[in-house]
Every structure is written in structure tokens, then in C-alpha cells.
């Protein structure tokens, strides 16, 4: 209960920034209570995933936008569901692409069985992978589209929002529970979001270890359909043809099985 109150307090802080940037018309469509519930649920899952890393040094960082908006079907967040395409359905395209950067086998079909979801996430952790969102708001797609429209000065409210919430991403990456490889590889999942994050962090992000995470436009891995693919991720991460992939079956170790 104490942790939940902390998350709700954090959300109120971020929501105030959103409120300051949105116009009155946009404010009317934003459902604060649902956004708060999604935020709390995602933060719990994020903390759990930090335990999963278990001193592994992050080599592959993927920066995303935010957890998807949901209202009636439960929170659909990467670190809770892995994939939200439905039980026994092939995972959505970008998750297949991500999986195949590291694994020669196909990713498991989605399942409601939590053990399958956790095993998939454990396998990615074994490959020193971390996904971090840059915004704390699971807004509806049309709400984000409205924010992304350019204003008269050539900027957008979306860029203002990413800049105003730049501490959200910075706090995530500076978490002392995360250990980093000597030269982490960075990719952005989405074009507009990546561009806004790069502008908001022109000097990069200095980690507690003294390492500097530097961002550039070559790291944007979004393809023509708006999502990253295996090829674009390999390009963003400068990882060649991923020749060191394995079939990823039975990749959990004993430490992860106990989580």
C-alpha cells in the first residue's frame, strides 16, 4: 500500500506537467484516474523487472514512448504481458523483430499463463536487453496525435511534453539497480518520440557510474509502418547481422526461475 501511494504521488507530479501543456479541449478527453491506474501497474512491473536483471549489464537499450492505452481489457505493458496480440496468436511484428535480433527461433505465441510471459522476458534479460519508456502517460492514440501537431512556431506540444517530462526517462536510466555494459547500444522505437527525446537530451544522460549515454538520429529504429524491425534494430544498435543468435529455448537460469 505504501508503494502504491508513492506511485500515485509520482503520477500527480507528472500529470501536472501534462495539464500545463494540454489545451482545455484536450484536457476534457483525458481520463486521469485510468491513467493513474495504468501508471501504478506499470511501475510495479518495472520494479519487478529490475530484479529480473539480477546484476546483468545492459548492452541493448530500446527507448519507447509509453505503455499503451487500455480501458476495459486490463493493462497491456511489455513487462506484464510481453505481447498483447491474444492467446495462441503470433506476436505482433515489432516483438518478433526484437526477438529475432537475439534468437534464431520464433518467439512463443502469447499466452495467459504468466509463466510463459515471464520466461520470454527472462530470455530477453539473459541477452542484456532493457526497454524503457520515455513518457509516463498511456494516452489514447488520437490524444498523442493532437499533441504532435505542429504549432505556429514550428514546434509541437508533444515536444514540449517530452522535454517537460525529461526527468522521467533520466530517473529510469539512472536507477542504481541497473548495471551497464562498457558501451551500451541505444535504439529508439518510434520516430517522433525519438526525435523529441534527442532534442530534450542534447547533452545525453550521465549515469551514476560516470558513463554518458549519447543520443543521435541514427539510433531511430522505426520503419515505414511506424515500428522497429529486426533489421532496423540491428542498424540502430550497430549489431551487424546478429550472427551470435541462438534458439533461445530453455534459456532461463536458476536465478531467474526463482523470480
Which residues fall in each region the model found?
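Detector for methionine-enriched segments
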Residues: 1, 223-225, 252
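A polyanion-binding, active-site-adjacent surface
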Residues: 2-201, 207
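Short linear motifs in intrinsically disordered/low-complexity regions
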Residues: 25, 194, 202, 217-219, ...
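Short, flexible loop segments at boundaries between secondary-structure elements
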Residues: 92-107, 204-247
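Extended, charge-rich low-complexity interaction segments
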Residues: 245-259
Amino acid at each position: 500500500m505504501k508503494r502504491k501511494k508513492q506511485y500515485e504521488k509520482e503520477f500527480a507530479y507528472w500529470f501536472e506537467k501534462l495539464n500545463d501543456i494540454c489545451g482545455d479541449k484536450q484536457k476534457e478527453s483525458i481520463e486521469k484516474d485510468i491513467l493513474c491506474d495504468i501508471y501504478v501497474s506499470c511501475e510495479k512491473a518495472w520494479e519487478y523487472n529490475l530484479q529480473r536483471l539480477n546484476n546483468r549489464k545492459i548492452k541493448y537499450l530500446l527507448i519507447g514512448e509509453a505503455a499503451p492505452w487500455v480501458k476495459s481489457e486490463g493493462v497491456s505493458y511489455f513487462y506484464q504481458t510481453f505481447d498483447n496480440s491474444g492467446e495462441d496468436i503470433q506476436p505482433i511484428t515489432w516483438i518478433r523483430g526484437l526477438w529475432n535480433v537475439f534468437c534464431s527461433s520464433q518467439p512463443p505465441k502469447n499466452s495467459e499463463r504468466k509463466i510463459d510471459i515471464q520466461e520470454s522476458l527472462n530470455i530477453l534479460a539473459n541477452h542484456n536487453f532493457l526497454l524503457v519508456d520515455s513518457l509516463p502517460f498511456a494516452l489514447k492514440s488520437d490524444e498523442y496525435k493532437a499533441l504532435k501537431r505542429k504549432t505556429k512556431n514550428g514546434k509541437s506540444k508533444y515536444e514540449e511534453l517530452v522535454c517537460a517530462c525529461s526527468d522521467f526517462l533520466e530517473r529510469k536510466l539512472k536507477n542504481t539497480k541497473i548495471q551497464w555494459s562498457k558501451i551500451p547500444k541505444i535504439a529508439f522505437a518510434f520516430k517522433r518520440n525519438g526525435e523529441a527525446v534527442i532534442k530534450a537530451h542534447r547533452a545525453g544522460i550521465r549515469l551514476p557510474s560516470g558513463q554518458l549515454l549519447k543520443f543521435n538520429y541514427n539510433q531511430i529504429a522505426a520503419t515505414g509502418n511506424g515500428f522497429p524491425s529486426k533489421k532496423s534494430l540491428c542498424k540502430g544498435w550497430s549489431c551487424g547481422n546478429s550472427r551470435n543468435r541462438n534458439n533461445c529455448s530453455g534459456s532461463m537460469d536458476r536465478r531467474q526461475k526463482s523470480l
